[in-house]
C-alpha cells in the first residue's frame, strides 16, 4: 500500500461515496491497485483503485496523473496544465458552442485526473491542518535571529506532532 497525497482538489470519481463532497488537496490515500497505463496530451495516466484512511477506507476508482509523483513542482506545472487543457479541448472540437465545450472539458476524466504525490514524508506547508505521531524538522537555514514568518513556520511544524518532535 503506497501512501499518496492528493495535491489538487477534485470533484469527480465520488459516485456512491458517503461523507466526501470532494477529494481535497492534502487528503491522504492508499494505492490498492493500478492498471491501464497510457500516455495522452504529453502526460502519463493510469487507472487506480485508492482508499481514503480518513474516510473509513472507502475506495474509489479514478484516473490519475503519474507525472506529479516525482515532479519537483507542487502539482502540474502551468505548461503541463495548459497542454492538458488544450489537448482535452481538442477532443471536444466537434462541440461548436463555446460554453458547452468548456463544460465538456470540465467534466472530462483526463482533465480531472487526480494529481498525486508520495506521502511517506510531507512538507510543513502541506501538513497544515493534519497531525502525525512524529514530526521531523529539517531546516538547514537556521539563523541567529528568526523572522516572524520563520517563527510561524516553526510553530506550525511543532504543533503537527502528537507524540514526538525530532
Predicted regions: what they are:
Residues 1-166:
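Core RecA-like ATPase module of SF1/SF2 helicases and allied nucleic-acid translocases
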